[in-house]
Amino acid sequence: MRTATLYRYSVPMEAGVILRHQRLKSRDGLLVKLQQGELSGWGEIAPLPEFSQETLDQAQVAAECWLQHWVSGVESDDSVLPSVAFGLSCAQAELKQTLPLSADYRKAPLCTGDPDELFAVLQALPGEKVAKVKVGLYEAVRDGMIVNVLLEALPDLTLRLDANRSWSRAKADGFAKYVNPALRSRIAFLEEPCKTRAESREFAQDTGIAIAWDESVREADFQVEAEPGVAAIVIKPTLVGSLARCQQLVQQAHQAGLVAVISSSIESSLGLTQLARLAAWLTPVTVPGLDTLDLMQAQVVRPWPDSPLPLITTEQLGVVWHR
Protein backbone atom coordinates (compact mmCIF):
# COMPACT_ATOMS: atom_id res chain seq x y z
CA MET A 1 0.00 0.00 0.00
CA ARG A 2 1.21 3.48 -0.86
CA THR A 3 0.77 6.63 1.21
CA ALA A 4 2.15 10.11 0.67
CA THR A 5 2.39 13.25 2.80
CA LEU A 6 3.23 16.79 1.79
CA TYR A 7 4.51 19.13 4.52
CA ARG A 8 5.10 22.87 4.24
CA TYR A 9 7.94 24.63 6.06
CA SER A 10 8.94 28.24 6.62
CA VAL A 11 12.35 28.96 8.13
CA PRO A 12 13.40 32.51 9.10
CA MET A 13 16.55 33.71 7.34
CA GLU A 14 19.42 35.63 8.83
CA ALA A 15 19.16 39.37 8.19
CA GLY A 16 20.84 40.58 5.06
CA VAL A 17 20.21 37.63 2.72
CA ILE A 18 19.58 39.34 -0.61
CA LEU A 19 18.72 37.55 -3.84
CA ARG A 20 18.90 39.49 -7.10
CA HIS A 21 16.56 42.32 -6.17
CA GLN A 22 14.87 41.40 -2.90
CA ARG A 23 15.66 40.52 0.68
CA LEU A 24 14.75 36.92 1.54
CA LYS A 25 13.11 37.01 4.98
CA SER A 26 12.14 33.34 5.13
CA ARG A 27 12.84 30.20 3.12
CA ASP A 28 9.60 28.45 2.30
CA GLY A 29 9.20 25.04 0.76
CA LEU A 30 7.56 21.64 0.77
CA LEU A 31 8.79 18.29 2.00
CA VAL A 32 7.34 15.15 0.47
CA LYS A 33 7.31 11.75 2.16
CA LEU A 34 6.50 8.63 0.14
CA GLN A 35 5.69 5.44 2.03
CA GLN A 36 5.37 1.96 0.55
CA GLY A 37 5.17 -0.90 3.02
CA GLU A 38 8.15 -0.61 5.36
CA LEU A 39 10.09 1.70 3.04
CA SER A 40 9.93 5.49 2.90
CA GLY A 41 11.59 8.27 0.93
CA TRP A 42 11.85 12.03 1.39
CA GLY A 43 12.35 14.90 -1.00
CA GLU A 44 12.30 18.70 -0.91
CA ILE A 45 10.40 20.98 -3.28
CA ALA A 46 11.53 24.56 -2.74
CA PRO A 47 11.42 26.96 -5.70
CA LEU A 48 13.82 29.84 -5.14
CA PRO A 49 12.21 33.28 -5.60
CA GLU A 50 13.67 35.25 -8.53
CA PHE A 51 15.51 32.17 -9.82
CA SER A 52 12.87 29.43 -10.24
CA GLN A 53 10.38 29.58 -13.10
CA GLU A 54 7.62 28.31 -10.79
CA THR A 55 6.15 29.70 -7.55
CA LEU A 56 5.73 27.61 -4.41
CA ASP A 57 1.94 27.55 -4.88
CA GLN A 58 2.34 26.29 -8.46
CA ALA A 59 4.80 23.66 -7.25
CA GLN A 60 2.35 22.51 -4.57
CA VAL A 61 -0.47 22.06 -7.10
CA ALA A 62 1.81 20.05 -9.41
CA ALA A 63 3.14 17.93 -6.54
CA GLU A 64 -0.34 17.12 -5.24
CA CYS A 65 -1.42 16.04 -8.74
CA TRP A 66 1.63 13.77 -9.11
CA LEU A 67 1.17 12.31 -5.62
CA GLN A 68 -2.51 11.59 -6.25
CA HIS A 69 -1.50 9.48 -9.25
CA TRP A 70 1.36 7.80 -7.36
CA VAL A 71 -0.82 6.79 -4.42
CA SER A 72 -3.28 5.28 -6.92
CA GLY A 73 -0.49 3.15 -8.39
CA VAL A 74 -0.01 5.22 -11.54
CA GLU A 75 3.62 6.04 -12.44
CA SER A 76 3.73 9.57 -13.87
CA ASP A 77 6.47 11.27 -15.87
CA ASP A 78 8.71 13.81 -14.15
CA SER A 79 7.03 17.15 -13.55
CA VAL A 80 7.91 19.92 -15.99
CA LEU A 81 8.53 22.14 -12.94
CA PRO A 82 12.20 21.64 -11.98
CA SER A 83 11.80 21.92 -8.19
CA VAL A 84 8.96 19.38 -8.24
CA ALA A 85 10.88 17.00 -10.49
CA PHE A 86 13.92 17.20 -8.21
CA GLY A 87 12.06 16.70 -4.92
CA LEU A 88 9.90 13.84 -6.17
CA SER A 89 12.84 12.07 -7.83
CA CYS A 90 14.79 12.24 -4.55
CA ALA A 91 11.85 10.77 -2.64
CA GLN A 92 11.51 7.97 -5.19
CA ALA A 93 15.27 7.29 -5.14
CA GLU A 94 15.25 7.03 -1.34
CA LEU A 95 12.23 4.74 -1.48
CA LYS A 96 13.96 2.48 -4.02
CA GLN A 97 17.26 2.87 -2.12
CA THR A 98 19.06 4.07 -5.26
CA LEU A 99 20.37 7.37 -3.81
CA PRO A 100 23.63 6.35 -2.12
CA LEU A 101 23.88 7.13 1.60
CA SER A 102 27.51 8.27 1.56
CA ALA A 103 27.71 12.06 1.40
CA ASP A 104 30.28 14.75 0.61
CA TYR A 105 29.89 17.27 3.43
CA ARG A 106 32.83 19.37 2.24
CA LYS A 107 31.62 22.78 1.19
CA ALA A 108 33.29 25.70 -0.49
CA PRO A 109 32.65 28.42 2.13
CA LEU A 110 30.50 31.26 0.84
CA CYS A 111 32.43 34.44 1.61
CA THR A 112 30.73 37.77 2.08
CA GLY A 113 31.60 40.88 4.02
CA ASP A 114 34.82 42.27 5.38
CA PRO A 115 38.08 41.05 3.73
CA ASP A 116 39.83 40.78 7.13
CA GLU A 117 37.10 38.43 8.40
CA LEU A 118 37.30 36.45 5.16
CA PHE A 119 41.03 36.07 5.58
CA ALA A 120 40.61 34.52 9.04
CA VAL A 121 37.91 32.10 7.83
CA LEU A 122 39.91 31.04 4.78
CA GLN A 123 43.16 30.64 6.68
CA ALA A 124 41.41 28.22 9.04
CA LEU A 125 40.08 26.00 6.22
CA PRO A 126 41.30 22.40 6.54
CA GLY A 127 42.59 20.51 3.50
CA GLU A 128 41.97 21.85 0.01
CA LYS A 129 41.30 25.58 0.30
CA VAL A 130 38.40 26.30 -2.07
CA ALA A 131 36.06 29.20 -1.37
CA LYS A 132 33.28 31.03 -3.17
CA VAL A 133 33.02 34.81 -3.36
CA LYS A 134 29.97 36.64 -4.67
CA VAL A 135 30.98 39.50 -6.93
CA GLY A 136 28.86 42.02 -8.76
CA LEU A 137 27.02 43.31 -5.68
CA TYR A 138 29.39 46.26 -5.25
CA GLU A 139 31.76 48.10 -7.57
CA ALA A 140 33.60 45.77 -9.95
CA VAL A 141 36.92 47.45 -9.16
CA ARG A 142 36.40 46.81 -5.42
CA ASP A 143 35.63 43.15 -6.17
CA GLY A 144 38.84 42.85 -8.18
CA MET A 145 40.91 44.35 -5.39
CA ILE A 146 39.43 42.02 -2.74
CA VAL A 147 39.97 38.93 -4.90
CA ASN A 148 43.55 40.00 -5.56
CA VAL A 149 44.25 40.57 -1.85
CA LEU A 150 42.87 37.14 -0.89
CA LEU A 151 44.82 35.28 -3.58
CA GLU A 152 48.00 37.17 -2.73
CA ALA A 153 47.68 36.57 1.01
CA LEU A 154 46.82 32.86 0.79
CA PRO A 155 49.04 31.11 -1.79
CA ASP A 156 47.17 27.78 -1.49
CA LEU A 157 43.71 29.30 -1.98
CA THR A 158 41.54 28.67 -5.05
CA LEU A 159 38.50 30.89 -5.57
CA ARG A 160 35.19 30.31 -7.29
CA LEU A 161 33.52 33.61 -8.15
CA ASP A 162 29.89 34.23 -9.04
CA ALA A 163 28.73 37.39 -10.81
CA ASN A 164 25.18 36.27 -11.74
CA ARG A 165 25.42 38.09 -15.10
CA SER A 166 25.59 41.43 -13.31
CA TRP A 167 28.40 43.10 -15.29
CA SER A 168 28.64 44.84 -18.61
CA ARG A 169 31.78 43.89 -20.53
CA ALA A 170 33.40 47.17 -19.43
CA LYS A 171 32.71 46.46 -15.75
CA ALA A 172 34.02 42.90 -16.09
CA ASP A 173 37.21 44.31 -17.59
CA GLY A 174 37.40 46.76 -14.67
CA PHE A 175 37.32 43.78 -12.30
CA ALA A 176 40.00 41.89 -14.22
CA LYS A 177 42.29 44.92 -14.33
CA TYR A 178 42.75 44.73 -10.55
CA VAL A 179 43.53 40.99 -10.46
CA ASN A 180 47.23 40.34 -11.02
CA PRO A 181 47.59 38.19 -14.20
CA ALA A 182 49.96 35.89 -12.28
CA LEU A 183 47.16 35.06 -9.82
CA ARG A 184 44.33 34.54 -12.30
CA SER A 185 44.96 30.81 -12.72
CA ARG A 186 43.86 30.35 -9.09
CA ILE A 187 40.40 31.58 -9.98
CA ALA A 188 38.89 28.14 -10.66
CA PHE A 189 36.10 29.90 -12.51
CA LEU A 190 33.97 33.02 -12.58
CA GLU A 191 30.29 32.16 -13.04
CA GLU A 192 28.57 34.13 -15.82
CA PRO A 193 30.46 37.45 -15.54
CA CYS A 194 28.56 39.31 -18.26
CA LYS A 195 24.97 39.83 -19.30
CA THR A 196 25.34 37.65 -22.42
CA ARG A 197 27.13 34.38 -23.09
CA ALA A 198 28.99 35.94 -26.02
CA GLU A 199 30.44 38.70 -23.81
CA SER A 200 31.39 36.18 -21.12
CA ARG A 201 33.20 34.01 -23.68
CA GLU A 202 35.13 37.03 -24.99
CA PHE A 203 35.99 38.11 -21.44
CA ALA A 204 37.44 34.66 -20.66
CA GLN A 205 39.54 34.58 -23.81
CA ASP A 206 40.80 38.16 -23.40
CA THR A 207 41.68 37.97 -19.68
CA GLY A 208 42.65 34.33 -19.14
CA ILE A 209 40.11 34.13 -16.30
CA ALA A 210 38.15 30.88 -16.71
CA ILE A 211 34.37 31.07 -16.63
CA ALA A 212 31.54 28.68 -15.71
CA TRP A 213 27.98 28.44 -16.95
CA ASP A 214 25.26 28.67 -14.30
CA GLU A 215 22.08 30.45 -15.45
CA SER A 216 22.83 29.29 -19.00
CA VAL A 217 22.52 25.63 -17.97
CA ARG A 218 18.80 26.20 -17.39
CA GLU A 219 18.12 27.83 -20.76
CA ALA A 220 16.45 25.88 -23.56
CA ASP A 221 19.17 26.51 -26.14
CA PHE A 222 22.09 25.53 -23.89
CA GLN A 223 24.36 22.66 -24.88
CA VAL A 224 27.19 21.28 -22.77
CA GLU A 225 30.35 21.49 -24.87
CA ALA A 226 34.05 22.19 -24.60
CA GLU A 227 34.81 25.85 -25.34
CA PRO A 228 37.96 27.97 -24.95
CA GLY A 229 37.99 29.63 -21.53
CA VAL A 230 35.07 27.60 -20.12
CA ALA A 231 36.07 25.46 -17.13
CA ALA A 232 32.84 24.25 -15.52
CA ILE A 233 29.09 24.05 -15.34
CA VAL A 234 27.20 24.66 -12.11
CA ILE A 235 24.24 22.35 -11.52
CA LYS A 236 21.56 23.53 -9.10
CA PRO A 237 19.13 20.59 -8.97
CA THR A 238 16.21 22.61 -7.58
CA LEU A 239 16.46 24.81 -10.68
CA VAL A 240 17.48 22.07 -13.14
CA GLY A 241 15.11 19.16 -12.46
CA SER A 242 15.16 15.46 -11.68
CA LEU A 243 18.08 13.34 -10.51
CA ALA A 244 18.16 11.79 -13.99
CA ARG A 245 18.53 15.25 -15.56
CA CYS A 246 21.34 16.14 -13.12
CA GLN A 247 23.09 12.86 -13.88
CA GLN A 248 22.81 13.54 -17.62
CA LEU A 249 24.34 17.03 -17.24
CA VAL A 250 27.23 15.71 -15.13
CA GLN A 251 28.00 13.00 -17.69
CA GLN A 252 27.89 15.51 -20.55
CA ALA A 253 30.20 17.88 -18.65
CA HIS A 254 32.75 15.18 -17.87
CA GLN A 255 32.69 13.95 -21.49
CA ALA A 256 33.44 17.53 -22.61
CA GLY A 257 36.31 17.81 -20.14
CA LEU A 258 34.46 20.28 -17.91
CA VAL A 259 34.12 20.29 -14.14
CA ALA A 260 30.55 19.79 -12.87
CA VAL A 261 29.71 21.40 -9.53
CA ILE A 262 26.60 20.41 -7.57
CA SER A 263 25.34 23.59 -5.94
CA SER A 264 22.65 24.71 -3.51
CA SER A 265 19.60 26.88 -4.15
CA ILE A 266 19.30 27.64 -0.40
CA GLU A 267 17.47 24.40 0.39
CA SER A 268 16.71 23.36 3.97
CA SER A 269 19.07 20.99 5.79
CA LEU A 270 17.08 18.02 4.44
CA GLY A 271 17.61 19.07 0.84
CA LEU A 272 21.24 20.00 1.49
CA THR A 273 22.07 16.56 2.92
CA GLN A 274 20.58 15.02 -0.23
CA LEU A 275 22.69 17.33 -2.40
CA ALA A 276 25.75 16.20 -0.42
CA ARG A 277 24.85 12.58 -1.24
CA LEU A 278 24.30 13.49 -4.90
CA ALA A 279 27.72 15.19 -5.01
CA ALA A 280 29.48 12.19 -3.44
CA TRP A 281 27.83 9.96 -6.04
CA LEU A 282 28.15 12.00 -9.25
CA THR A 283 31.07 14.42 -8.65
CA PRO A 284 33.24 12.73 -5.98
CA VAL A 285 36.45 14.65 -6.73
CA THR A 286 34.83 18.11 -6.83
CA VAL A 287 34.00 20.13 -3.71
CA PRO A 288 30.26 20.94 -3.95
CA GLY A 289 28.82 24.42 -3.42
CA LEU A 290 26.61 23.78 -0.40
CA ASP A 291 27.56 26.46 2.14
CA THR A 292 24.11 28.03 2.57
CA LEU A 293 22.75 26.49 5.78
CA ASP A 294 24.14 29.29 7.95
CA LEU A 295 21.92 31.74 6.07
CA MET A 296 18.98 30.14 7.93
CA GLN A 297 17.97 30.18 11.57
CA ALA A 298 16.92 26.51 11.81
CA GLN A 299 17.30 23.07 10.26
CA VAL A 300 14.41 20.94 9.00
CA VAL A 301 13.80 17.22 9.78
CA ARG A 302 17.34 16.03 8.94
CA PRO A 303 20.36 17.76 10.46
CA TRP A 304 23.56 18.71 8.68
CA PRO A 305 26.54 17.19 10.57
CA ASP A 306 27.80 19.37 13.43
CA SER A 307 25.43 22.26 12.75
CA PRO A 308 24.45 24.07 15.97
CA LEU A 309 21.16 25.29 14.49
CA PRO A 310 17.93 24.05 16.13
CA LEU A 311 16.05 21.28 14.30
CA ILE A 312 12.40 21.61 13.28
CA THR A 313 10.84 18.14 13.50
CA THR A 314 8.11 16.58 11.36
CA GLU A 315 5.62 17.10 14.20
CA GLN A 316 6.22 20.86 14.04
CA LEU A 317 5.47 21.10 10.31
CA GLY A 318 2.07 21.74 8.77
CA VAL A 319 0.60 18.90 6.68
CA VAL A 320 -0.88 20.31 3.46
CA TRP A 321 -1.76 17.01 1.76
CA HIS A 322 -2.02 13.35 2.83
CA ARG A 323 -3.43 10.20 1.26
Swiss-Prot record:
UniProt keywords, alphabetically: Lyase, Magnesium, Menaquinone biosynthesis, Metal-binding
Molecular functions (GO terms): hydro-lyase activity; magnesium ion binding; O-succinylbenzoate synthase activity
InterPro entries tied to this protein: Enolase-like_C_sf, Enolase-like_N, Enolase_C-like, Mandelate_racemase_C, OSB_synthase_MenC1, OSBS_N
A Pfam family per the record: MenC_N
GO biological process, one term: menaquinone biosynthetic process
The organism's place on the tree of life at top rank: Bacteria
Matching Gene3D superfamilies: Enolase-like C-terminal domain, Enolase-like, N-terminal domain
Catalytic activity: (1R,6R)-6-hydroxy-2-succinyl-cyclohexa-2,4-diene-1-carboxylate = 2-succinylbenzoate + H2O
SMART domains, per database record: MR_MLE
E.C. no: 4.2.1.113
Pathway this chain belongs to: Quinol/quinone metabolism; 1,4-dihydroxy-2-naphthoate biosynthesis; 1,4-dihydroxy-2-naphthoate from chorismate: step 4/7; Quinol/quinone metabolism; menaquinone biosynthesis
Positions annotated to bind Mg(2+): 162, 191, 214
Family: Belongs to the mandelate racemase/muconate lactonizing enzyme family. MenC type 1 subfamily.
Protein name per UniProt: o-succinylbenzoate synthase
Source taxonomy: Bacteria, Pseudomonadati, Pseudomonadota, Gammaproteobacteria, Enterobacterales
Chain's gene name: menC
